[in-house]
Amino acid sequence: MLGITVFTTFLAYASSCGAPIFQPNLSARVVGGEDAIPHSWPWQISLQYLRDNTWRHTCGGTLITPNHVLTAAHCISNTLTYRVALGKNNLEVEDEAGSLYVGVDTIFVHEKWNSFLVRNDIALIKLAETVELSDTIQVACLPEEGSLLPQDYPCFVTGWGRLYTNGPIAAELQQGLQPVVDYATCSQRDWWGTTVKETMVCAGGDGVISACNGDSGGPLNCQAENGNWDVRGIVSFGSGLSCNTFKKPTVFTRVSAYIDWINQKLQL
């Protein structure tokens, strides 16, 4: 009965997901790019850990229900205490209007997460309390299970990652256009080759626009035909050479490959 209740609740707000009050600027970039319009990606969260009595940004994530956040498995350490910052634009402003800080109840890391091969890089965070949705805090939509996007489909990566290779973490949320690179292309030898699996999705690779350190766990935002935004990917890895290497697009965990796993964890 509990599972039915949770799933029914999920369907109730899913109909209004992925619809920001403040519309995003759809021509911005991440690396070497521009600030996002404040609160135009209201499902974007900052995952923060406590060290020396200070909360520090470590990864991004996506609010998918008022109680749950999607992020990357590689963002999670059993030795750290976490909180989730919601409704944020500027991480340097602690009491930013419209923002909220929530503790963590449970973290579900995928049972088959492989840190060496970077497989199944997905985790679901259950928040310690239910978040009240607002103009600055909204949920993203989940894509249809198994669905794929075509080559060059326009998507946007968002995060507070480094503005450029070895540069500083961004204070204000960044965004950038990263078109999808299909599996047939991304798995070619001079791209990512066999490193990329069908449970992943690639985007970018033009040598200019890229996710960077600190963006990990954050969403690949793709607009559906109905105008709402789906979280199609979770930032997983990129080139070790630099943040924006030609033919080395950002690699994301493909969310549509894990819908069944996500739904199972939502019921726990």
Swiss-Prot record:
Propeptide positions in this record? 17-29
Q: Which gene encodes it?
A: CTRC
Q: What is the lineage of its organism?
A: Eukaryota, Metazoa, Chordata, Craniata, Vertebrata
Q: What protein family is recorded?
A: Belongs to the peptidase S1 family. Elastase subfamily.
| Glycosylation-annotated residues | N25
Q: What is the annotated signal peptide range for this record?
A: 1-16
Q: Name one Pfam family in it.
A: Trypsin
Location in or out of the cell: Secreted, Extracellular space
Question: What keywords are assigned to this protein?
Answer: Disulfide bond, Glycoprotein, Hydrolase, Protease, Secreted, Serine protease, Signal, Zymogen
The job of this chain, per UniProt, is described as:
Regulates activation and degradation of trypsinogens and procarboxypeptidases by targeting specific cleavage sites within their zymogen precursors. Has chymotrypsin-type protease activity and hypocalcemic activity.
Q: Name the chain's protein.
A: Chymotrypsin-C
